[in-house]
C-alpha cells in the first residue's frame, strides 16, 4: 500500500495522485507540485489515503511544499489573466487568418510561460502568431495541439 493525495489544478479538471511526502495534508488545502507543464499550485481534493501499489502511477511525484497565501493568490490571478490571454490570442488568430480553434490558455504558476491549447484540421504555421503573443505577454509562448495530447 502507498500513501497518496489527489490534487486538481482546474476547477472541474482531472485529479492526479502525488506523494504527500510524509505531510498530513487535508482536503481543501493547496500544494505546490512539479508537473510536466512546470511548477503548479493545486487544490487537494482527497487528503492522505492508502491505495494499492498497483493503482499508483510509476512516476509518482512528491509534493514540493504546502502552498502559502501568496501562491494561492498568484494561482487565482493567473486564472483571471488566462481569460484575457485567451481573448487576446483569439484576436491574433483572427488577424493572422489561421485555421485553428483556440481551446484554452494556461499560465504556469511562475508565469514563465503560457500554453495555448488548440485544435486544427491540418498543419498550421503559427510562428508569426507566437512572435506576436510573446511581444504582448513578455513570456514564453507554447502552442499545444490537442491532437498531439491523445
State where each predicted segment sits.
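N-terminal, positively charged regions that mediate nucleic acid binding
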Residues: 1-52
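Terminal, basic amphipathic appendages of nucleotide-handling enzymes
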Residues: 39-97
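Short edge beta-strands and adjacent turn/loop segments
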Residues: 100-110
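Short glycine/threonine-rich beta-strand-turn micro-motifs
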Residues: 110-118
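Helix N-cap motif at beta-to-alpha junctions
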Residues: 119-123
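Internal active-site segments that recognize and position negatively charged phosphoryl groups
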Residues: 128
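A common structural junction motif
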Residues: 133-140
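Conserved small/polar residues in nucleotide/adenosyl-binding loops
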Residues: 147-150
Amino acid at each position: 500500500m502507498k500513501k497518496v493525495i489527489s490534487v486538481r489544478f482546474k476547477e472541474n479538471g482531472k485529479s492526479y495522485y502525488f506523494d504527500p511526502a510524509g505531510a498530513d495534508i487535508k482536503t481543501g488545502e493547496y500544494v505546490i507540485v512539479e508537473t510536466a507543464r512546470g511548477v503548479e499550485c493545486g487544490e487537494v481534493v482527497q487528503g492522505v489515503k492508502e491505495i494499492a501499489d498497483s493503482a499508483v502511477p510509476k512516476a509518482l511525484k512528491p509534493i514540493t511544499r504546502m502552498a502559502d497565501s501568496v501562491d494561492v493568490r498568484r494561482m487565482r490571478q493567473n486564472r483571471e489573466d488566462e481569460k484575457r490571454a485567451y481573448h487576446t490570442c483569439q484576436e491574433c488568430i483572427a488577424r493572422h487568418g489561421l485555421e485553428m480553434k483556440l481551446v484554452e490558455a494556461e499560465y504556469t504558476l511562475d508565469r514563465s510561460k503560457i500554453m495555448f491549447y488548440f485544435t486544427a484540421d491540418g498543419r498550421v504555421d503559427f510562428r508569426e502568431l507566437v512572435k506576436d503573443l510573446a511581444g504582448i505577454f513578455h513570456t514564453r509562448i507554447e502552442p499545444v495541439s490537442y491532437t498531439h495530447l491523445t
